[in-house]
């Protein structure tokens, strides 16, 4: 099941955004987007991606309740054919719930660890929090200070801890009882779910608000490389296209390490693929980094690109930023430039 706490949908909206694309306008819709420019991208069109569910499921149910006043809950079912059933449902909370009845070839997606692997690979930095819960798992608990209690916490028990005291000798050599820990009011609550995603990755922040330690920690987290990078470039461009990212120059030990880097490409904080050569100049594939370009012209396969002219501009921009960084270092920080020469010389020579 996929459950959200969003706006939900009315019956008319389910009909418009889910049903019509599939059964009345699929051919026209695809024809409309064929050979169009980047303004008419097919990827990300609301409702279309939903139908990939039938690649793994024999049957799909949607239960939704709109936030709109007086809206009735909707229950929609389809087995992937040309017919569907829609009637009033029994959902009582605003949002949408999608249930997949997996086919025999796709039972791997019912495995908790496989799902965690997929989420962490593709959705680690989605702009919403993603939680993974196992049905019928035993309830876990945690104890927190009462002052830390949130409105959505489920309280199991309230706990009062008396102040702790010790007998100590004062300056006069007399014994006296002193308080070493004040009384505390605590609460035992249902354990809070832990998000698998970070909605505000470092590359989305302004470079001036990021510390060196944050850059290094992000590098360790994303690339599982505990050798510190030499330096990095924070990309932050809004015009003529939207592109953000961080490129790291790793220390290259050609004797022991592979000299192939990893540059992860994202679209609206969703992972697309590693090392797409149409976007990343080949000589920069020694670097490690992340690049997020919402304007990237993806086609239906998501990993392939269209519109070579636009992609070429992105590639040229990235190359220029790397060249500017190395040129600036040569002019203003000659000592570091010479110290890192063995590691940066492949880029200079190119």
Report each predicted region and the residues it spans:
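Extended, well-ordered alpha-helical scaffold/bundle regions in very large, multi-domain proteins
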Residues: 298-336
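GHKL (Bergerat-fold) ATPase N-terminal catalytic module, capturing the glycine-rich phosphate-binding loop
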Residues: 1-110, 117, 124-125, 140-147, ...
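Helical mechanochemical/support elements of P-loop NTPase systems and associated helical scaffolds
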Residues: 10-17, 38-46, 52, 56, ...
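Conserved, well-folded catalytic cores of nucleic-acid-processing
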Residues: 17-28, 32, 36, 56-63, ...
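Cytosolic catalytic regions of ATP/NTP-dependent phosphoryl-transfer enzymes
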Residues: 61-69, 73-145, 178, 191-208, ...
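GHKL/Histidine-kinase-like ATPase module
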Residues: 113, 152-291
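Glycine- and acidic
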Residues: 2-3, 41, 100-101, 201-203, ...
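A contiguous, basic/glycine-rich beta-loop/short-helix subdomain that forms a polymer-engagement track
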Residues: 335, 339-350
């Amino acid at each position: 099941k996929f459950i959200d706490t969003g706006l939900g949908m009315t019956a008319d909206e389910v009909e418009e955004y889910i049903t019509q694309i599939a059964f009345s306008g699929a051919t026209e819709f695809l024809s409309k987007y064929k050979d169009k420019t980047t303004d008419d991208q097919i990827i990300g069109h609301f409702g279309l991606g939903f139908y990939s569910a039938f690649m793994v499921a024999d049957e799909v149910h949607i239960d939704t309740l709109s936030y709109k006043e007086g809206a009735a809950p909707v229950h929609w079912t389809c087995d992937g054919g040309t017919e569907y059933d829609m009637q009033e449902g029994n959902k009582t909370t605003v949002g949408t719930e999608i249930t997949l009845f997996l086919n025999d070839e796709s039972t791997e997606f019912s495995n908790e660890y496989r799902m965690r692997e997929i989420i962490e690979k593709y959705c680690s930095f989605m702009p919403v929090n993603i939680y993974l819960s196992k049905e019928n798992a035993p309830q876990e608990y945690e104890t927190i200070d009462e002052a830390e209690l949130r409105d959505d916490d489920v309280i199991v028990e309230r706990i009062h801890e008396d102040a702790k005291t010790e007998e100590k000798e004062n300056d006069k050599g007399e014994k006296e009882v002193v308080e070493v820990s004040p009384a505390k009011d605590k609460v035992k609550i249902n354990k809070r779910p832990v998000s698998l995603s970070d909605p505000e990755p470092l590359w989305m922040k302004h470079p001036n608000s990021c510390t060196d330690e944050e850059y290094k920690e992000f590098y360790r987290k994303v690339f599982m490389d505990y050798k510190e990078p030499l330096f990095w470039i924070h990309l932050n461009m809004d015009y003529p296209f939207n592109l953000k990212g961080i490129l790291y120059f790793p220390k290259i030990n050609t004797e022991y390490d592979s000299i192939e880097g990893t540059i992860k490409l994202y679209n609206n904080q969703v992972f697309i693929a590693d090392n797409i050569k149409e976007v990343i100049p080949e000589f920069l594939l020694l670097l490690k980094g992340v690049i997020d370009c919402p304007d990237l012209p993806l086609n239906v396969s998501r990993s392939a690109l269209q519109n070579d002219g636009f992609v070429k501009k992105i590639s040229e921009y990235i190359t220029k930023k790397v060249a500017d960084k190395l040129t600036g270092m040569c002019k203003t920080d000659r000592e570091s430039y010479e110290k890192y020469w063995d590691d940066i010389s492949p880029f200079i020579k190119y």
